[in-house]
A protein has these predicted regions:
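Non-catalytic, peripheral interaction segments enriched in hydrophobic/basic residues
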Residues: 1-2, 20-154
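Short, conserved micro-motifs composed of acidic
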Residues: 1-19
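Glycine-centered secondary-structure boundary/capping sites
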Residues: 8, 12-14, 25, 103-107, ...
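Charged boundary/loop elements
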Residues: 82-84, 138-243
Length: 243
């Protein structure tokens, strides 16, 4: 965004030349500005609410609140509106806050595989706590593609590959989904579903038979079994250690 010319305003008007602003609930400007703006709007408010999940003394209800009110749904608008390269640390901070909220509910530390599984959608045996950083390219790319016809209706034909933010999202999406093609479905739902499946496949290759069976057994109607199975496994381990 270019800075305004001072001569275009009355001489007695004070002006502040800056490339940064916010419009329609989203920041525009430098990566630092966008990053700080999202941390103030999404992360700090969410982290204030996370400690109250434990006070419910009902892990299942707390998990539902975490999933639908304090996790990916809280970030998805920003992910669709802000370029991938403009949130260098906000996504990491937010994902870490969600993980800490989940661990506070279960009282146990999750291993790497359990963390990955918790970020999968329910249909893939997860808890639906999608990582904002992983799904940011899919969200921004989908938003850009869905707006293409509208944008072209107001402007002349555009070379989308020469638009840096779109090209960057396309590149990162190809890294997350190696077999992605331009003619594939551009909706965020489909792109995130493919990302989830690749995550699940990668996680399954590292799971032992018992944990793989647990992963495949968990589905949308029984997502609470994920937490119960994990707790039972940890309690069994603690019992063996005590003996």
């Amino acid at each position: 965004m270019g800075k305004p010319d001072h001569h275009s305003f009355p001489s007695d008007m004070k002006t502040h030349a800056t490339p940064n602003c916010d419009i329609l609930g989203a920041p525009i400007g430098t990566p630092d500005h966008c990053d700080e703006w999202v941390m103030n709007k999404a992360i700090r408010k969410a982290t204030k609410l996370m400690p109250h999940l434990v006070k419910l003394d009902a892990p299942h209800h707390a998990c539902l609140l975490l999933r639908y009110c304090l996790s990916f749904s809280r970030m998805v608008f920003y992910l669709r509106a802000i370029p991938v390269d403009c949130l260098p640390s906000a996504c990491d901070r937010f994902d870490q806050a969600v993980l800490q909220g989940l661990q506070s509910i279960t009282y146990y530390k999750f291993d790497d595989n359990a963390i990955i599984q918790s970020s999968l959608r329910l249909a893939n045996g997860g808890l639906g706590l999608r990582k904002s950083k992983l799904h940011h390219p899919a969200a921004y790319y989908a938003s850009f593609r869905q707006s293409k016809d509208l944008i072209c209706g107001f402007t002349s034909s555009l070379n989308w590959n020469n638009m840096p933010h779109f090209a960057s999202a396309r590149t990162k999406l190809s890294e997350a989904i190696p077999d992605f093609k331009d003619e594939d479905s551009p909706t965020q739902r489909d792109l995130s579903a493919r990302t989830d499946l690749l995550q699940k496949s990668d996680c399954s290759t590292r799971l032992m038979v018992r944990n793989k069976a647990r992963s495949n057994a968990v589905s949308a109607p029984r997502e609470v079994q994920f937490s119960r199975a994990f707790l039972r496994q940890r309690l069994a381990m603690d019992s063996r250690q005590m003996n």
